[in-house]
Structure formats: structure tokens, C-alpha cells
Amino acid sequence: MQDHSYSFVVDATPPEVWAVFWGHRNHVVEHRVVRIEYLHWGDETGNGRIRHCRFPVPRYLLSGGVGRSWEWLTEVKPHESWRYDSIGKPLWSRATGWIRLEDLGDGRTRVHFRETYEAFNPILRALLERRVHRFISRDNDWYMKSAIERGVRAMREAR
């Protein structure tokens, strides 16, 4: 099993960061090479939200360099945290992730991210799991931070 964590600081309050993830009703969100399609919105807080994601994977997995995951979001605490569980392919796997927002004051938020990842097949787990997860995760912090900053900027400009 792989375990990947990082955190970063953005110049936005927790409610602003929250709104980037939870305040829109777009059915499809694209950020560079990542595409997220929302299939079900969940309850009023977003608990039970279901999404389908498309993202880059190594070409040697013979999927045209495209990975897919189906994710459901739970343990949603508005302006604080949420969890997701997912099933992904082409290296059939499961992942669990946690995102937590820490208010630093002065209009800044530290975003904490952690994900565990495990391939189902024990042979592929031994041969490919670490390499594939490293590839998938290598730019996650940059993608998430830049998406938040872009979203916050757009919300502020729209005011």
C-alpha cells in the first residue's frame, strides 16, 4: 500500500477554498490534463457526491496514457474536511483520500491532503503499484494548489 501526503498554503479563507470544491454546479470541471465529471451531487453538504475522474497514467499500462477513477465523497464537514474512496483503472486499484482545511488567520488556509493507494492484484501490486502511484501523485500538490488559486481568483473577480 502506498501512502502520500502533502500540504500547502493559499491566500484564501477556508470558506473560499471550500467554495472552489463545493460551491459550483458544473457537471464537468477540467484543469489542464485532469477532468472531473460529477455524476451525483449528494446531500445538502455534498455527502455522497459521486464523480468520475480522468487523469494521466504511464503509457506502459496500455490505456493510451489515461487513467480513470470513480469516487464517492463522505465524512463531509463544511469548511473543514472531507474524505473520498475510489476505484481506479487501468491498474485496478482502490484509494482513500482525506482533505482538511486549516484556518491560519489573515485570510490564509493550509490545505492538508493524504491518500492511500493499493492495487488489487498482488502481482501487479508488487511490480507496478509504487511506480504507478508515484506517477499519478507527482504533481497533485501543484494541480490542487493552482486549481484552488484559479478558482478563488475567478470567484473574487465575479463579485
Segment roles from a protein language model:
Residues 63-64, 92-96, 121-127:
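A short, polar/proline- and glycine-enriched secondary-structure boundary/capping micro-motif
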Residues 11-15, 44-46, 74-81, 100-110:
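A short, structured loop/turn motif at beta-sheet edges
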Residues 1-46:
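Hydrophobic ligand-binding cavity/cleft-lining segments
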Residues 5-8, 68-75, 86-88, 95-103, ...:
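Hydrophobic/aromatic beta-strand elements that line small-molecule binding cavities or substrate pockets
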Residues 26-29, 38-90, 142, 146-159:
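Glycine-rich portal/gate segments that line the openings of hydrophobic small-molecule binding cavities
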Residues 116-159:
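A conserved amphipathic terminal alpha-helix motif
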Residues 1-9, 50, 68, 81, ...:
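Intrinsic-disorder/low-complexity, polar/charged segments enriched in Ser/Thr/Lys/Arg/Asp/Glu/Gln
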